[in-house]
């Protein structure tokens, strides 16, 4: 048997995927109020929130001063987040997509019940083959980082798997609406921790982000994340897609650990097979 020390901090409470209520198809965003709540630990053996919490705006006013954080391909090049293109990044989709709502899968009415109207507009825009579903290819084409690079394949596949309730490799309008909210929440968190407003997360900013989300992880671990998920350069920094991927996987692994750590001690003992089973069953 092996012992795996975990230290103290881990966000959320026991449950399924981030923010998902029991039996829910869709994991929630970091501030969804579900099983993970705000992404902060509730107290006890896993530590408490950092002073001020991680969700308030950074000092000096609003997060960026620009309405476009660089998620969907809109805006104009310039600063790290650009300016909003006509129609905004989250308002109506570009005229080249669907234009006004047309007869189709959902008729001429508004968004289906329980679907965010803005998410529905973007669903119509992203669904380029008019199939009524969003594939990984379509999702990847629709999502860009602040440096105008496309989201990486790993993050896109992870999000498809999270919100694909039919396990068909694509998401319907309801899954897309949940995904849209999920990305919005992580984007807002990304903006807050990008203290220098560079459009990316540096090593120092990532260390601060993990700490304020409730994780008590060593600088060496943060450096490992930077080495693994940031492009090699003199000053490596993490884009939005990798930030979403890293934080979501940390949440999922935390849940797996918490299920075993019934005494909330920060340490567990388990066999190698139990360890790999626990990890493999939580892979997204």
From Swiss-Prot:
Chain intervals with Low complexity compositional bias: 8-26, 65-75
Region (Disordered): 1-111
Transmembrane segments: none
SUPFAM superfamilies reported in the protein's UniProt record: EF-hand
Binding of Ca(2+) 2, residues: 194, 196, 198, 200, 205
Gene Ontology terms, MF aspect: calcium ion binding; calcium-dependent protein binding; identical protein binding; protein dimerization activity; protein heterodimerization activity; RNA binding; ubiquitin-like ligase-substrate adaptor activity
Outcome recorded upon mutating residue 137 to R: Decreased ubiquitination by the BCR(KLHL12) E3 ubiquitin ligase complex
Membrane topology of the entry: Peripheral membrane protein
Residue stretches in coiled coil: none
Protein name: Peflin
Organism lineage: Eukaryota, Metazoa, Chordata, Craniata, Vertebrata
